[in-house]
Curated annotation (Swiss-Prot):
One of its GO terms (cellular component) is cytosolic large ribosomal subunit. This is one of the proteins that bind and probably mediate the attachment of the 5S RNA into the large ribosomal subunit, where it forms part of the central protuberance. CDD domains: Ribosomal_L18_L5e (cd00432). SUPFAM superfamilies: Translational machinery components. This is Large ribosomal subunit protein uL18. One of its GO terms (molecular function) is structural constituent of ribosome. GO terms for biological process: ribosomal large subunit assembly; translation. The gene is rpl18. Part of the 50S ribosomal subunit. Contacts the 5S and 23S rRNAs. Transmembrane segments: none annotated. NCBIfam families: PRK08569.1 (NF006342).
């Protein structure tokens, strides 16, 4: 592993691929609050964090599993769920007194149209200011119209594949073709439930 006497071992969290210390250092120097977005294989996690010398303080947070409390029956990590989770976290942050934050994407490499930007769009729409340029957030994808169109097409072409691919939606009692309407219902439920 070592390459001679001048080899410098990186910090443990950097070796594990968890922390970019240079980026974290810039956040600390800015003294700005951060909206930390992490995507796992199944879920979306959003936290609003303030810096403190003793350790970061989490002011508000939301997890995509919490969407089920508001009636969400879809997947917990698609673009629609990302938006709703960001919106929920933004409302909680506003209630806690945060008005603006910087996006902390961790080790994620920004790609146009990525799910992580749907989270930030949800945060912005909730009323928290986050600097974000044109990153390819599509309003049709935000509401799940692309999923509904694909489900409609697949049901006609290959019903077995349709039932297999959308089995979780169907088991939860949601027809994937009705996802845009379901999205609006859940969004209204979040707006009324988090006041």
């Amino acid at each position: 592993m070592a390459h001679g006497p001048n080899y410098k071992v990186k910090y443990r969290r950097r070796r594990e691929g968890k922390t970019n210390y240079y980026r974290r250092y810039t956040y600390v120097l800015n003294r700005s609050d951060r909206v930390v977005v992490r995507l796992t294989n199944k879920y979306v996690i959003v936290q609003f964090v303030k810096f403190d010398p003793k350790g970061d303080i989490t002011v508000a947070a939301a997890h995509s599993r919490e969407l089920m409390k508001f009636g969400w029956k879809g997947d917990e990590n698609n673009s629609t769920a990302c938006y709703l989770t960001g919106y929920l976290a933004g409302l909680r942050a506003k209630k806690a007194g945060m008005t603006s934050a910087s996006a902390d994407l961790g080790l994620f490499t920004p790609t146009k149209g990525a799910r992580i930007f749907y989270v930030l769009k949800g945060v912005i729409d909730s009323g928290v200011k986050v600097p974000m340029g044109d990153v390819g957030v599509n309003n049709d994808r935000l509401a799940g119209k692309h999923i509904a169109e694909y489900a409609k097409k697949l049901e006609q072409e290959d019903p077995d594949k349709y039932r297999g691919l959308f089995s979780r939606y169907l088991a939860r009692g949601l027809d994937p073709k009705d996802l845009p309407a379901h999205f609006k219902e859940v969004l209204n439920s979040i707006k009324s439930g988090e006041k």
